[in-house]
């Protein structure tokens, strides 16, 4: 079983161990992030491989809306640190290493493809603006 530690992120703090952040407020609670934000938890691991595996596990849990059940609050929903840890630990108990590594590799490729498409859309939007400005 993987060993990880989850804490509330303090702005300005740096971490020596491999880590990532998960958003804890709003409808995107549970979303893994590479860079910190004011409303997030930090998950630290021992190795980079564990960090990567947990990152994509949290991404899968977010997309599958497993964190949504634990959201509290009426105006700004949030997830508590104990609930986030409970969801992650439950998912870790159900995961098989070999199959999960294959899924992580596929998720990496999909994420890279998605970023490429977003960059292409941005370039097309700029091209459209340049074309319209050239017409005037």
Walk through the language-model features, giving the residues of each.
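Sequence-specific dsDNA recognition surfaces
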Residues: 1-15
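Short coil-to-beta transition motif at edge beta-strands of beta-rich domains
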Residues: 17-20
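A short acidic, often aromatic-flanked loop/helix-cap motif at beta-alpha or helix-coil junctions
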Residues: 11-12, 51, 95-97
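Short amphipathic alpha-helical patches
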Residues: 41-45, 77-85, 90-94, 111, ...
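A short beta-sheet element
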Residues: 24-76
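A short, structural micro-pattern
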Residues: 15, 35-37, 81
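Glycine-anchored helix-breaking recognition loops at helix->coil/strand junctions
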Residues: 61-102, 116, 121
């Amino acid at each position: 079983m993987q060993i990880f530690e989850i804490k509330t992120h303090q702005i300005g703090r740096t971490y020596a161990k491999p880590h990532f952040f998960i958003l804890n407020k709003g409808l995107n609670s549970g979303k893994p992030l590479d860079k910190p934000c004011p409303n997030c938890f930090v998950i630290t691991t021992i190795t980079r491989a564990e960090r990567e595996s947990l990152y994509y596990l949290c991404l899968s849990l977010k997309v599958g809306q497993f964190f949504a059940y634990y959201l509290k609050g009426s105006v700004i929903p949030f997830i508590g640190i104990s609930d986030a840890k409970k969801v992650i630990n439950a998912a870790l108990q159900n995961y098989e290493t070999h199959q999960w590594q294959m899924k992580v590799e596929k998720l990496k490729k999909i994420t890279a493809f998605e970023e490429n498409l977003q960059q292409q859309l941005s370039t097309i939007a700029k091209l459209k603006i340049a074309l319209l400005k050239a017409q005037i």
